């Protein structure tokens, strides 16, 4: 008896789905999930997996540092230009004072950006920062930051640090830790459905306790 091509393809899809589910349950998802990773220098290091809130803060800090570097470069160029013009001491003193004021303004802007009180204000600050550091041309980075801002559960460094400490104590795989920090699961059953590898690793009661603590730490804009 001949088996139709469509039937064969359907069976293959089912087998593939079963295989994918089994791999997800054991985190057999490729080399990038191995606990030991090789960095660009050829050195072995521990796997790092970030939840959405951590990723958001890392990128924000990188953008802030880029703006500071840009401002320092501008200041250095300005001083070099003044030196070539043989500015007198009085003028130089005034310029140095202006530089200090500019530095204070930059630090104030950075502080406001890192501690934005509302999602809307943070998105506005992101637009300004990207304009200053990338010319506003990096749409992918802008979309990434918008996504992270909209879906991050924990807003500030202190809260993210508390989340890291809480989840680190579980002894779970870094990927599982990152997923628990990103997904707003209400029950242990939901968490184990979305993160199949948690089954047989942690009891429902313990997982419920962790989910409750994560919910208490969650920041509402």
From Swiss-Prot:
Residue positions, PTM N-acetylmethionine: 1
Region (Disordered): 1-23, 71-120
Pfam families assigned: RNA_pol_Rpb4
Keywords, comma-separated and alphabetical: Acetylation, Cytoplasm, DNA-directed RNA polymerase, mRNA processing, Nucleus, Phosphoprotein, Transcription
SMART domains from the UniProt entry: RPOL4c (SM00657)
Any one GO cellular component localisation term in the record: cytoplasm
GO molecular function, one term: nucleotide binding
Compositional bias of kind Basic residues: 71-83
GO biological process, one term: nuclear-transcribed mRNA catabolic process, deadenylation-dependent decay
SUPFAM superfamilies: HRDC-like (SSF47819)
Modified residues (Phosphothreonine): 91-92
Compositionally biased region (Acidic residues): 92-112
InterPro entries per record: HRDC-like_sf, RNA_pol_Rpb4/RPC9_core, Rpb4-like, Rpb4/RPC9, Rpb4/RPC9_sf
Top-level taxon of origin: Eukaryota
Subcellular localization(s) per the UniProt record: Nucleus; Cytoplasm; Cytoplasm, P-body
Subunit description: Component of the RNA polymerase II (Pol II) complex consisting of 12 subunits. RPB4 and RPB7 form a dissociable subcomplex associated with the 10-subunit Pol II core complex. In exponentially proliferating cells, only approximately 20 % of the Pol II complexes contain the RPB4-RPB7 subcomplex. In starving cells, that enter stationary phase, RPB4-RPB7 is associated with Pol II in a stoechiometric manner. The RPB4-RPB7 subcomplex probably associates with TFG1. Interacts with LSM2 and PAT1.
Family assignment from sequence similarity: Belongs to the eukaryotic RPB4 RNA polymerase subunit family.
Role description: DNA-dependent RNA polymerase catalyzes the transcription of DNA into RNA using the four ribonucleoside triphosphates as substrates. Component of RNA polymerase II which synthesizes mRNA precursors and many functional non-coding RNAs. Pol II is the central component of the basal RNA polymerase II transcription machinery. It is composed of mobile elements that move relative to each other. RPB4 is part of a subcomplex with RPB7 that binds to a pocket formed by RPB1, RPB2 and RPB6 at the base of the clamp element.
Protein name: DNA-directed RNA polymerase II subunit RPB4
Primary gene name: RPB4
């Amino acid at each position: 008896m001949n088996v139709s091509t469509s039937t064969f393809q359907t069976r293959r899809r089912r087998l593939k789905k079963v295989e994918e589910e089994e791999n997800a349950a054991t985190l057999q998802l490729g080399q990038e999930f191995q606990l030991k990773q090789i960095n660009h220098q050829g050195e072995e290091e521990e796997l790092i997996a970030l939840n959405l809130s951590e990723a958001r803060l890392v990128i924000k800090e990188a953008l802030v540092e880029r703006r500071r570097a840009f401002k320092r470069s501008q200041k250095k160029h300005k001083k070099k230009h003044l030196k070539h013009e043989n500015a007198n001491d009085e003028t130089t003193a005034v310029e140095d004072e202006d530089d200090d004021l500019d530095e204070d303004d930059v630090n104030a802007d950075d502080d406001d950006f890192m501690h934005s009180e509302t999602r809307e204000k943070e998105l506005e600050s992101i637009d300004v920062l990207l304009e200053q550091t990338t010319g506003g041309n990096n749409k992918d980075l802008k979309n990434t930051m918008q996504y992270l801002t909209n879906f991050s559960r924990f807003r500030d460094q202190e809260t993210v640090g508390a989340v890291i400490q809480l989840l680190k104590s579980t002894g779970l795989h870094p990927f599982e830790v990152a997923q628990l920090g990103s997904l707003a699961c209400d029950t242990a059953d939901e968490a184990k459905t979305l993160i199949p590898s948690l089954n047989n690793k942690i009891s429902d009661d313990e997982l419920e306790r962790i989910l409750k603590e994560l919910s208490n730490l969650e920041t509402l804009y």
